[in-house]
UniProtKB/Swiss-Prot annotation:
Annotated positions of the Asymmetric dimethylarginine modification: 223, 319
GO terms assigned for molecular function: DNA binding; RNA binding
Organism: Mus musculus (Mouse)
Site, Interaction with RNA: residue positions: 100, 108-109, 133, 138, 142, 166, 176
Organism superkingdom: Eukaryota
Cellular component annotations (GO), alphabetically ordered: cytoplasm; neuronal cell body; nucleoplasm; nucleus; perikaryon
Ranges of Polar residues composition bias in the record: 49-74
UniProt xrefs under InterPro entries: Fox-1_C_dom, FOX1_RRM, Nucleotide-bd_a/b_plait_sf, RBD_domain_sf, RBFOX1-3, RBFOX1-like, RRM_dom
Expressed in which tissues: Widely expressed in brain, including in cerebral cortex, hippocampus, thalamus, caudate/putamen, cerebellum, as well as in the spinal cord (at protein level). Not expressed in all neuronal cells within a region, in cerebellum, expression is absent in Purkinje cells (at protein level). Expressed in the retina in the ganglion cells and some cells in the inner nuclear layer, but absent from the photoreceptor cells and most cells in the inner nuclear layer (at protein level).
Name this polypeptide is given: RNA binding protein fox-1 homolog 3
Domain RRM: 99-175
Cell location: Nucleus; Cytoplasm
Biased composition (Pro residues): 1-29
Modifications the protein undergoes after translation, according to the UniProt entry: Phosphorylated.
């Protein structure tokens, strides 16, 4: 009875570049048959009889394996040879590239010819550069060789040598690293002041629309000026300016009292002002200006807007706008407290000390700029 053939098995696709005809055959079920003539190992295939099938000989795989091996080894050799051929021509190219060396701790009297003479014995030098500042040499420089092989040889020979009592160091120069630039000046007009002092003395403070003094033109003229000494030049310019016209938001007499009087503090009592029938003169020394019945009238101080009208003007205007008659029934202050009579401390508080502009500026700087070194 004939044995049925096993199902046909096709060889797998070629792998690793090995042709399909040299791939090992698929495994077959091994059966033991007697009376069959063994096939010589040199044959690469198994002979089948019509009645019986012969098992696959062990020598078949052995005969096919060397064939596959003999095909792969030359391919690996060819690939290695190709890689070597690609690497060897590139080595001379790399050696021909220029290379830069960093030389540090050189004597301060060294100049470019001295450094060129020191390194010139090792090969052709393309460039020599010693770094200087305003005081002279900084003690290091750069030497650029035409070939990297000469640069490596110079680095090996000269690194650590003693030159005029100084041990020089020669290393490969690294790529230049661009450090972050310093942040730009926050003031567009070039003022280099801290925020507190810049707020007090900066021209922008006097150029805002809420400031009642017409100093915009003066501020624009001084815009961009690099100041010294706390911006005193521009500050003195504002002080030397003629007295400004009356504040638009307050009455003329009230403006003179607020601006040309000492700084009114919260505890000061209101000074009654006499009614004025004639137009207000430009200066208090005019004969047409009626005398004030206020104890402060003898002390006339021209206050800047920062210390007088702008900061304390709101509260002072409120206090001075109260009725001048002492028989007022009741009045309230800015905190909502209602008083049935005049301020009980009206006659106990005398005139405050008059501070000059420089003293007030010093007080402001000392109080709010405690971290300023001077």
């Amino acid at each position: 009875m004939a044995q049925p053939y096993p199902p046909a098995q096709y060889p797998p696709p070629p792998q690793n570049g090995i042709p399909a005809e040299y791939a090992p055959p698929p495994p077959h079920p091994t059966q033991d048959y007697s009376g069959q003539t063994p096939v010589p190992p040199e044959h690469g295939m198994t002979l089948y009889t019509p009645a019986q099938t012969h098992p696959e000989q062990p020598g078949t795989e052995a005969s096919t394996q060397p064939i596959a091996g003999t095909q792969t080894v030359p391919q690996a050799d060819e690939a290695a040879q190709t890689d070597n051929q690609q690497l060897h021509p590139s080595d001379p190219t790399e050696k021909q590239q220029p290379k830069r060396l960093h030389v540090s701790n050189i004597p301060f009297r060294f100049r470019d010819p001295d450094l060129r003479q020191m390194f010139g014995q090792f090969g052709k030098i393309l460039d020599v550069e010693i770094i200087f500042n305003e005081r002279g040499s900084k003690g290091f420089g750069f030497v650029t060789f035409e070939t990297s092989s000469d640069a490596d040889r110079a680095r090996e020979k000269l690194n650590g040598t003693i030159v005029e009592g100084r041990k020089i160091e020669v290393n490969n120069a690294t790529a230049r690293v661009m450090t972050n630039k310093k942040p730009g000046n926050p003031y567009a007009n070039g003022w280099k002041l801290n925020p507190v002092v810049g707020t007090v003395y900066g021209p922008e403070f006097y150029a805002v629309t809420s400031f009642p003094y017409p100093t915009t033109g003066t501020a624009v003229a001084y815009r961009g000026a690099h100041l010294r000494g706390r911006g005193r030049a521009v500050y003195n310019t504002f002080r030397a300016a003629p007295p400004p016209p009356p504040i638009p938001t307050y009455g003329a007499a009230l403006e003179q009292t607020l601006v040309k009087m000492p700084v009114p503090w919260a505890g000061l009592a209101p000074c009654p002002l006499p009614p004025q029938q004639t137009p207000e003169p430009a200066y208090p020394t005019s004969p047409a200006f009626p005398p004030l019945s206020c104890p402060f009238a003898s002390r006339v101080v021209y206050q800047d807007g920062f210390y007088g009208a702008e900061i304390y003007g709101g509260y002072a205007a409120y206090r001075y706008a109260q009725p001048a008659a002492a028989t007022a029934a009741a009045y309230s202050d800015s905190y909502g407290r209602v008083y049935a009579a005049a301020d009980p401390y009206h006659h106990t508080i005398g005139p405050t000390a008059t501070y000059s502009i420089g003293t007030m500026a010093s007080l402001c700087r000392g109080g709010y700029s405690r971290f300023t070194p001077y």
